[in-house]
Amino acid sequence: MKKKIGLLVMAYGTPYKEEDIERYYTHIRRGRKPSPEMLEDLTERYRAIGGISPLATITLEQAKKLEKRLNEVQDEVEYHMYLGLKHIEPFIEDAVKDMHNDGIQDAIALVLAPHYSTFSVKSYVGRAQEEAEKLGNLTIHGIDSWYKEPKFIQYWVDAVKGIYNGMSDAEREKAVLIVSAHSLPEKIIAMGDPYPEQLHETADYIARGAEVANYAVGWQSAGNTPDPWIGPDVQDLTRELNEKHGYTSFVYAPVGFVAEHLEVLYDNDFECKVVTDEIGAKYYRPEMPNASDAFIDCLTDVVLKKKESVL
């Protein structure tokens, strides 16, 4: 009989319906309810992208496809997928409890975020390992980052090339690629967090592969807190690049995210487009990885490499 291995797929989570927004936001704010104004602002953003984010559906599809693919490409072990979310059910701890109840003794933990940071990957894996230790007889093997995975870089190289190939030579000369990820509080830099450096590396790999000379790194979707967040913000960066270099076509690659959701559909497709419209420039944003075969193949390689190194 094949050994069963847990596949713990972790992600941020998103409201399933409008009524979930308040409790979801309260969880993000560590139990503090948002003010009516804050709640209204977030609700309006969801309404602007069609009422609710497609993230929940995409995340589940990514996880199910990954489990299926892992069991197709090898027959040494049997992977059982468990979904654990940071801010809404099924919570990370619930997924770990389910694994334990199913008799799983080893699990590979994959966060659907390519770059490592103490705020994201470390906290997700930490929560899972803490719960596993409480329950006993279950070891969680966490994957720190996978932004260097060749198939991840290739996904974005192909996506960016697809946009540039549709441009005339004249437009290409005046085009710039903005590679971005979710901003985090600036204090992580002083803590030696590798997150900003990893995004810069990712941008270099993609630009080199797609043969794009003009590119910059930006940050987006910063939280509304008194602490300073890492910049430049993508909107400010767009204006600056237009003023300083005269770029008139902007290609946004939000590579820190793996699916279409609020941060991409609103913060990029709406807010960044407002800026490009304002300055008379063209807006482009390649398709996100979502549950595409190319992306699932990438994640399959990531999990298999981790499994080989620990089990």
UniProtKB/Swiss-Prot annotation:
<comment type="function">
    <text>Involved in coproporphyrin-dependent heme b biosynthesis. Catalyzes the insertion of ferrous iron into coproporphyrin III to form Fe-coproporphyrin III.</text>
</comment>
<feature type="binding site">
    <location>
        <position position="182"/>
    </location>
    <ligand>
        <name>Fe(2+)</name>
    </ligand>
</feature>
<dbReference type="InterPro" id="IPR033659">
    <property type="entry name" value="Ferrochelatase_N"/>
</dbReference>
<keyword id="KW-0350">Heme biosynthesis</keyword>
<dbReference type="Pfam" id="PF00762">
    <property type="entry name" value="Ferrochelatase"/>
</dbReference>
<keyword id="KW-0479">Metal-binding</keyword>
<feature type="binding site">
    <location>
        <position position="29"/>
    </location>
    <ligand>
        <name>Fe-coproporphyrin III</name>
    </ligand>
</feature>
<dbReference type="GO" id="GO:0006783">
    <property type="term" value="P:heme biosynthetic process"/>
</dbReference>
<dbReference type="GO" id="GO:0046872">
    <property type="term" value="F:metal ion binding"/>
</dbReference>
<keyword id="KW-0456">Lyase</keyword>
<dbReference type="InterPro" id="IPR001015">
    <property type="entry name" value="Ferrochelatase"/>
</dbReference>
<comment type="pathway">
    <text>Porphyrin-containing compound metabolism; protoheme biosynthesis.</text>
</comment>
<feature type="binding site">
    <location>
        <position position="263"/>
    </location>
    <ligand>
        <name>Fe(2+)</name>
    </ligand>
</feature>
<dbReference type="GO" id="GO:0005737">
    <property type="term" value="C:cytoplasm"/>
</dbReference>
<protein>
    <recommendedName>
        <fullName>Coproporphyrin III ferrochelatase 1</fullName>
        <ecNumber>4.99.1.9</ecNumber>
    </recommendedName>
</protein>
<keyword id="KW-0627">Porphyrin biosynthesis</keyword>
<feature type="binding site">
    <location>
        <begin position="45"/>
        <end position="46"/>
    </location>
    <ligand>
        <name>Fe-coproporphyrin III</name>
    </ligand>
</feature>
<keyword id="KW-0963">Cytoplasm</keyword>
<feature type="binding site">
    <location>
        <position position="53"/>
    </location>
    <ligand>
        <name>Fe-coproporphyrin III</name>
    </ligand>
</feature>
<feature type="binding site">
    <location>
        <position position="124"/>
    </location>
    <ligand>
        <name>Fe-coproporphyrin III</name>
    </ligand>
</feature>
<dbReference type="InterPro" id="IPR019772">
    <property type="entry name" value="Ferrochelatase_AS"/>
</dbReference>
<comment type="similarity">
    <text>Belongs to the ferrochelatase family.</text>
</comment>
<feature type="binding site" description="axial binding residue">
    <location>
        <position position="12"/>
    </location>
    <ligand>
        <name>Fe-coproporphyrin III</name>
    </ligand>
</feature>
<dbReference type="InterPro" id="IPR033644">
    <property type="entry name" value="Ferrochelatase_C"/>
</dbReference>
<keyword id="KW-0408">Iron</keyword>
<dbReference type="GO" id="GO:0004325">
    <property type="term" value="F:ferrochelatase activity"/>
</dbReference>
